[in-house]
């Protein structure tokens, strides 16, 4: 069972109680802090759509600390990030691995950040299937298509040649925040929000 902190906001004579995620959403902040699955994707997509409707001109900020997760769920978030009108600023705090790294790289160019001690990791999709030989073959072909799709998305957002992405994703490929900047996954390593 997880405990969600609450925040009490006072304005004049009234008090308003928010769960922490709702309060962050009020400031146009979305936090992805778990493995990415269908439930997480649906919540993030709903938040993106809500924030676009609320003000299509103001940036949306996505903070990421995730080991990755389901490719289909991550691609649903990715497509929505590309679909909405507001710029999406992405921030890696802790880790952005696998599908979470794709989302980090998919932020608006110039607005992709990593904190100094965060790590990112790219690799090929992982899948396992058993059953009849024909079904195994169908799933193997599908995972290879997903591998090509994800490699092309990473190449598009990082500016790296597809051949380099293909080579680097063959195995787990870890990067520090500075290495992620050199790779093109983030634009800047930041240590403070203060200006």
Curated annotation (Swiss-Prot):
Matching Gene3D superfamilies: 2-enoyl-CoA Hydratase, Chain A, domain 1
Q: One Pfam annotation, family name?
A: CLP_protease
**Keyword vocabulary terms for this entry:** Cytoplasm, Hydrolase, Protease, Serine protease
Where is it chiefly localized?
cytoplasm
**Position of the signal peptide:** none
Per its UniProt record, what PANTHER family does this chain match?
Answer: ATP-DEPENDENT CLP PROTEASE PROTEOLYTIC SUBUNIT (PTHR10381:SF70)
Can you tell me which family this protein belongs to? Belongs to the peptidase S14 family.
- Subunit composition? Fourteen ClpP subunits assemble into 2 heptameric rings which stack back to back to give a disk-like structure with a central cavity, resembling the structure of eukaryotic proteasomes.
What the protein does? Cleaves peptides in various proteins in a process that requires ATP hydrolysis. Has a chymotrypsin-like activity. Plays a major role in the degradation of misfolded proteins.
- Which protein, by its recorded name, is this? ATP-dependent Clp protease proteolytic subunit
Q: Which organism is it from?
A: Thermodesulfovibrio yellowstonii (strain ATCC 51303 / DSM 11347 / YP87)
